């Protein structure tokens, strides 16, 4: 059975933890393992933080959009912003690359997403924002997360 949820919120850093927990609660109905759930929460955190810090450059008037689609043992996440976009996507996806070293950013966001998810697609246009599509296939091991 397919189930879908959408969420939008102001681009405030304090909303990142809400987004992470909110998505995890929705995904729990598929009964992921604790490891899978932790990986998804981490990926949501990374993508939302990127949207807030890099996409909107801390402008709280921006809106972050998240959708989740659940189908059988598959989770599809989309995190989108309408910020400044990524100027060099290949460079941004390199481990340890950051445009905000003064904020003590590690530059590992995309690397984490690529390691924790089965599919990662990033679409970005300068001045029009960034959309990240993430897919995770769950082990369906009846982990009793519910």
From Swiss-Prot:
Pfam family, one: HATPase_c_2
The enzyme's E.C. designation: 2.7.11.1
Keywords tagged on the record: ATP-binding, Kinase, Nucleotide-binding, Serine/threonine-protein kinase, Sporulation, Transferase
Family membership noted in the UniProt record: Belongs to the anti-sigma-factor family.
Organism, scientific name: Bacillus cereus (strain ATCC 14579 / DSM 31 / CCUG 7414 / JCM 2152 / NBRC 15305 / NCIMB 9373 / NCTC 2599 / NRRL B-3711)
Superkingdom field: Bacteria
GO molecular-function terms, A-Z: ATP binding; protein serine kinase activity; protein serine/threonine kinase activity; sigma factor antagonist activity
InterPro entries: Anti-sigma-factor_SerPK, Anti-sigma_F, HATPase_C_sf
Biological process annotations from GO: asexual sporulation; negative regulation of DNA-templated transcription; negative regulation of sporulation resulting in formation of a cellular spore; sporulation resulting in formation of a cellular spore
Gene3D superfamilies: Histidine kinase-like ATPase, C-terminal domain
Underlying gene: spoIIAB
UniProt enzyme class: transferase
Full protein name: Anti-sigma F factor
Purpose: Binds to sigma F and blocks its ability to form an RNA polymerase holoenzyme (E-sigma F). Phosphorylates SpoIIAA on a serine residue. This phosphorylation may enable SpoIIAA to act as an anti-anti-sigma factor that counteracts SpoIIAB and thus releases sigma F from inhibition.
HAMAP family documented for this protein: Anti_sigma_F (MF_00637)
Reaction(s) catalysed by this chain's protein: L-seryl-[protein] + ATP = O-phospho-L-seryl-[protein] + ADP + H(+); L-threonyl-[protein] + ATP = O-phospho-L-threonyl-[protein] + ADP + H(+)
């Amino acid at each position: 059975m397919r189930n879908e949820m959408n969420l939008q919120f102001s681009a405030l850093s304090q909303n990142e933890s809400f987004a992470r927990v909110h998505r995890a609660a929705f995904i729990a109905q598929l009964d992921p393992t604790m490891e899978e759930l932790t990986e998804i929460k981490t990926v949501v955190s990374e993508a939302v933080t990127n949207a807030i810090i890099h996409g909107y450059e801390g402008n709280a008037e921006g809106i972050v959009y998240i959708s989740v689609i659940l189908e059988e043992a598959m989770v599809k996440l989309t995190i989108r912003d309408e910020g400044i976009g990524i100027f060099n996507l290949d460079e941004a996806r390199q481990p340890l690359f950051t445009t905000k070293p003064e904020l003590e950013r590690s530059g590992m966001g995309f690397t984490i997403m690529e390691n924790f998810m089965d599919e990662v697609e990033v679409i970005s246009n300068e001045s029009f924002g960034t959309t990240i599509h993430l897919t995770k296939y769950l082990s369906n091991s009846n982990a009793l997360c519910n």
